[in-house]
UniProtKB/Swiss-Prot annotation:
Coiled coil: none annotated. This is Uncharacterized protein slr0516. Pfam families: Pentapeptide. It comes from the Bacteria. Transmembrane segments: none annotated. Gene3D superfamilies: E3 ubiquitin-protein ligase SopA. InterPro entries: 5peptide_repeat (IPR001646). Residues 38-77, 78-117, 118-157 form the Pentapeptide repeat domain. Keywords: Repeat.
Length: 166
C-alpha cells in the first residue's frame, strides 16, 4: 500500500516542481535594483537621471546609460566595463579607480571629472569632452581619442593609447 502512495506522489511532486520553474520571473525596475543592490548588469538606464544616486562600487557592466545624467555622481571603483555611455553627462563625476574597459563614451561630457587611476582600456571617447578632467595614473591603452577635448586635462603617469606615459 505504501508503494502505491509513493508511486502516485512522486509524479505529482515532479509536475508541481516543473510548474514552479516555468513561472515568469517578476520584472524588477532597474532603478530600484540599482538603488537597493548597487548593481544593474545589462540594464537599460538610457536617459536616466542618476544625480541623486551614490554609485560607489556599483556594478553596471554592459548596461545602456546612453544620454544618462550622472553629473557629480560618486562612481568611485564602479564597474562599467562594456557599458554604453554615449552622450552621457558625467561632468564633475568621481570615477576614481573605476573600470570602463571597452565602454562607449563617444560624445560624453566628462569635463571636470576625476578619472584618477581609472581603467579606460579600449574605450571609445570619440568627440568626448574631457576639459579639466583629472587623468592621473589612468590607463588609456588602445582608447580612441579622436576629436576629444583635452584642454586643461591633468596627466600624471597616464598610460596613453599607444602605451606611452604622459
Amino acid at each position: 500500500m505504501n508503494n502505491k502512495k509513493l508511486s502516485l506522489t512522486l509524479p505529482l511532486v515532479g509536475i508541481l516542481a516543473l510548474t514552479a520553474c516555468n513561472q515568469p520571473k517578476e520584472e524588477i525596475d532597474p532603478l530600484s535594483q540599482l538603488r537597493e543592490k548597487g548593481e544593474c548588469l545589462d540594464c537599460n538606464l538610457a536617459g536616466a537621471d542618476l544625480r541623486e544616486f551614490n554609485l560607489e562600487n556599483a556594478r553596471l557592466n554592459r548596461s545602456d546609460l546612453s544620454g544618462a545624467n550622472l553629473s557629480g555622481v560618486n562612481l568611485r571603483r564602479a564597474l562599467l566595463d562594456r557599458a554604453n555611455l554615449t552622450g552621457a553627462n558625467l561632468s564633475e563625476t568621481d570615477l576614481t579607480e573605476a573600470a570602463l574597459t571597452e565602454a562607449n563614451l563617444a560624445g560624453a561630457d566628462l569635463s571636470g571629472a576625476n578619472l584618477e587611476r581609472s581603467f579606460l582600456r579600449d574605450v571609445d571617447l570619440t568627440g568626448a569632452n574631457l576639459k579639466g578632467a583629472n587623468l592621473a595614473w589612468a590607463n588609456l591603452t588602445a582608447a580612441n581619442l579622436t576629436d576629444v577635448d583635452l584642454e586643461e586635462a591633468e596627466f600624471w603617469e597616464t598610460t596613453m593609447p599607444d602605451g606611452s606615459r604622459r
